[in-house]
Design a protein with these regions (language model features):
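Metallocofactor- and cofactor-centric catalytic cores in central/energy metabolism, strongly enriched
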Residues: 1-205
């Protein structure tokens, strides 16, 4: 039986005599420039959450002059972290949800061009190919209902949205997204099946 690995000892002198730069932590930064498009009517009639949301939108860098635009929500099952050049920074669970962030970006840019204020939220999906022969298979069918519930809650949690676009793939994420959009019958919705759906150039399947 191997002995536990001991961590390097750190003395008090190591701490007090360390490079002072490690203690120079940035705790403040300039806020976004501009003014929120507030009106007397908004302050009197709108929910307080709408006003708070404006501060969050500006804090993320959106031009305050455009925050009065109609909001449109984009949902997806994106997984992994893909660098702009396509290099994997962190892998997803399967190739189906690996690149749908590109579709989300294209949709968001088009919505912004058309005068909307795009929002995006995500709930990724598992791969039962990976869980074959393990107890992870027990989660595949249950995931559909769980994710549909999460997507529905994400829709309701953005009260200012005027419509929803869902991008999803495969036999778990796509049904989950379909159920979520179908349950939001009061909103205009678009479902986009995305991901790796082209046949390989060299192979049977």
């Amino acid at each position: 039986m191997s002995s536990p690995v001991k961590s390097a000892e750190l003395s008090f002198a190591d701490i007090v005599e360390s490079d002072r730069a490690v203690w120079e932590v940035q705790t403040a930064a300039p806020g976004p420039e501009g003014r929120l498009p507030l009106t007397a009517e908004m302050l009197l009639e709108r929910p307080s959450g709408d006003i708070f949301g404006l501060t969050q939108n500006a804090g993320m860098g959106w031009d305050p002059r455009e925050l009065g635009r109609p909001g449109f929500l984009l949902l997806s099952t994106q997984g992994g972290i893909r660098a702009p050049d396509g290099r994997p920074v962190a892998l997803g669970y399967h190739t189906g949800h690996w690149e749908i962030g590109l579709l989300m970006q294209a949709a968001a840019e088009e919505l912004a061009r058309l005068g909307c204020l795009p929002f995006a939220a995500f709930c990724s999906d598992p791969c039962d190919g990976r869980t074959q022969g393990t107890t992870g298979m027990l989660d595949s069918l249950a995931y559909r209902n769980d994710a549909a519930q999460v997507f529905r809650r994400l829709i309701r949690s953005l009260p200012t949205r005027k419509g929803v676009l869902g991008v999803a793939t495969c036999d778990k994420g796509l049904p989950a997204m379909m159920m979520a959009l179908a349950s939001s019958a009061d909103l205009p919705s678009v479902l986009v099946p995305g991901g790796v759906m082209l046949a390989t150039s060299d192979g049977e399947d």
